């Protein structure tokens, strides 16, 4: 070494400092080496600066870490190939590694063992590595590379979690296989980032379990994807599972992501068939099973026919069991489901499922007017009557805009106070007209049937039906159960909502009077609305007696519109609806209930929504707590991984220092052994000189 480097010579310096092992930095030697080689030499670096970043770094280095600059002629004839040990010009120094792959573009992948990493370099950034023995340069042998499935530099895919729910795969490069606590792990580099470095760009690799690694799928050429093909989409730097939902122009597809249900438009090049790595073999991914509509998963709803659009469904015969006695005891025995359905001709057409079905009893109430006087259907379930001050006697027994108020008998045969008052106002012509009802029945029924359905209803055995059944409106014959009010308007019965209410209604079927006359055309339009047929209402509007007379009907109309509007609003509620909105809707329905609206169903639905929202809020809070714990656990796990990586690096450094110390010890022992031999030789020479001296001194004169 003394013959090759001197003060002022350009040298290369290495170090055992963590993070700088196997790296050589250029510098200028500022003092001559000593003969003993034990004194540290001062070196001024050419590429490293002090902490102030202004002046060159100067250090005192042990001679064993200093070597001459390799001469250019030593590189002649060396071809860089896979397995060649090289030095790479990187971060102001020459870093020693091994070429693991030569790319077609003339670039090279270089593997470093401490710390483990793989970096891509240009050819002009590399030089063959030479080792200085102290008096000459030595070339390392070509290293044999591992060619296993997950060897260093192999492209693979690593699983990750996207949106906290979906398992996706991102391309990665295997850096090194390691073993931690007896478990096999891999150090990988995300290949979505550039492998080349520029400036002070810093990147960290990841240490992952072997279960999260799979080989890169081989190319599965697909000329064109079909609808519902299960594919993988390269989106957001990862491969995610999806289904082809649309084939577009320009070789593009609309794909539905399986987990998030997003439907992005992607190019053909960003798709590949869905494959699964199982038992060391690529298998086809799970197929999409088409959903088959069955009676269990498809809601079937039969629309109701309005009176004007329904076909004639009048039964061809009636039964004697259709008779209803106005006596309470007899009616309690005879009014059963079978008898009620027999009275309607055993019709089987159903209304919407949530309103009425075949098992719902149909209630038939006594009628007091000829069927010829039936007016358009009104939405009230209770009987209505024109206020007394608007009545006028109808002496001819024919339909007129103003009907004479006629009382209605109770189910038990008694008369209430209203009946008493009305009977006092009736005249003899009224009684005569009532006796003529049976004779006028057939012609009146024909007239009403033609006006409602446009067809002639066939009526048989009408003589076997009691007067109350004969006077039913035609809507009852087309499976639209009704009652007829005192003013001859058929009224839809909401018997689906209260099936157990039949006996009570039979016992307490008293006359109820609306606080207004139905003059508005709204009531006719109301009948044709589908929602009104699905959820019919019969409010009594009794609180409106306290309102001004001219405001009563329009207030009632507003309430009807508000009720069905609120029903629609409840139906369209979304998951993010606020509890205050639900509370406001509940209060609105409670206010409508005071006017006789049946709000049990919407109130029950609102209460259930509030309960579900409370439960959802609790689950969300529970999930939030778990997410925090998971995040804390992941951070703690990463901390342990970093600590283990640091310990591994320290172990590697200690092993390297051990090797260096062993080499130094062997060299020192060799020198010491030589010096001992030389010392013995000198001792022998000294002894010889002593003997010669004595011989000389004792020689005779």
Curated annotation (Swiss-Prot):
InterPro entries membership: Agenet-like_dom, Agenet_dom_plant, DUF724
CC terms in the record's Gene Ontology section: nucleus
Biased composition (Basic and acidic residues): 326-340, 403-412, 421-430, 437-449
Coiled-coil segments: 626-670
Localisation: Nucleus
Polar residues composition-biased segments: 381-399
Keyword check for Acyltransferase: no
Keywords annotated in UniProt: Coiled coil, Growth regulation, Nucleus, Transport
Region listing for Disordered, in residue ranges: 299-353, 374-452
Tissue: Expressed in roots, stems and flowers.
Keyword Coiled coil attached: yes
Source species, domain of life: Eukaryota
Location of the DUF724 domain: 514-700
Main function: May be involved in the polar growth of plant cells via transportation of RNAs.
Identification of the protein by name: DUF724 domain-containing protein 6
Source organism of the structure: Arabidopsis thaliana
